[in-house]
């Protein structure tokens, strides 16, 4: 094997969506760093008899994938669900390689996605307040003299992201600190600076109404006062709002973004690790109750249970 050990390994989580999986992989293959990168594919087992053939079709496809330095496939005999599949899969790979890039089977990636992710993971590795690197971003307004290719937020994105072992390993997946959070209004207000939907999703997770790795990931980020890095030009768009989606069924205009189609391969990163009020305000507005209410009554409303 002649793969490049300085590049972060890529974990791809798939289930039963052949077309979406193919689109994700093909966009990843168009990245110049793909040939030097390791790809680890985790295929979850079918939930029921109806899904079995679709799972098998995806598995037949992933065994034909080429274009990477090394490909390893892990097929589960049982249905773990996305949360357990992702947590266990990432833990397996990140424990060995100490950093990871994570994809699900519903994304379209820019051709410079791997350049951006690897450069950001290297640049911010020793800046311990940075919790994760996001590849997705929605359209934000920046000062005219803004010269960086990234910004910082209180909320991570689950659509193409990366992190490091020392941030991942201590995460409280069991939400042991929730009891001290539940009735503390000030903590709710602070958590919801990343979006007024966060506390509600966390409560639903604790009650067992959703099974989400992402809300637990974001809650741990809040508890530790971490920040997320995201690009000023999105390196990812989501292609997963279909009837076959496990967690997202309806597309939302709030998540429309423009994919970076430039040939840029080196990026300018922020040295000063602090949150900016104008970014926080835009995130809060984007994920606000009013914004979600507009979606609910629009033709493009969506439902998330991730």
Stretches with model-predicted labels:
Residues 1-102, 107-306:
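An acidic/histidine-cluster motif and surrounding catalytic segment
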């Amino acid at each position: 094997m002649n793969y490049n050990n300085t590049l972060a390994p890529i974990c791809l989580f798939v289930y039963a969506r052949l077309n979406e999986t193919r689109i994700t992989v093909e966009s990843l293959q168009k990245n110049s760093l793909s040939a030097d990168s390791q790809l680890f594919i985790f295929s979850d087992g079918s939930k029921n008899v109806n899904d079995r053939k679709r799972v098998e079709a995806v598995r037949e496809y992933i065994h034909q994938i080429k274009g990477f330095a090394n490909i390893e496939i892990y097929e589960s005999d049982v249905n773990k669900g996305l949360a357990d599949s992702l947590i266990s899969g990432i833990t397996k790979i990140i424990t060995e390689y100490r950093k990871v890039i994570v994809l699900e089977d519903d994304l379209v990636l820019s051709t410079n996605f791997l350049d951006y992710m690897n450069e950001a993971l290297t640049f911010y590795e020793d800046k311990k307040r940075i919790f994760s690197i996001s590849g997705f971003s929605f359209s934000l307004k920046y000062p005219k003299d803004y010269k960086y290719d990234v910004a910082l937020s209180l909320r991570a994105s689950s659509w193409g992201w990366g992190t490091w072992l020392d941030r991942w390993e201590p995460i409280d997946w069991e939400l042991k600190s929730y009891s001290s959070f539940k009735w503390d209004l000030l903590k709710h207000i602070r958590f919801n600076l990343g979006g007024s939907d966060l506390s509600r999703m966390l409560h639903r997770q604790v009650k067992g109404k959703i099974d989400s790795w992402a809300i637990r990931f974001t809650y741990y980020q809040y508890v530790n006062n971490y920040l997320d890095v995201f690009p000023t030009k999105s390196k990812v768009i989501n292609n997963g709002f279909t009837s076959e989606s496990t967690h997202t069924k309806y597309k939302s205009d709030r998540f429309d973004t423009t994919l970076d189609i430039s040939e840029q391969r080196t990026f300018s990163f922020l040295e000063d690790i602090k949150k900016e009020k104008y970014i926080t305000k835009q995130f809060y507005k984007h994920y606000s109750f009013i914004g979600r209410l507009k979606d609910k009554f629009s033709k493009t409303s969506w439902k998330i249970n991730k």
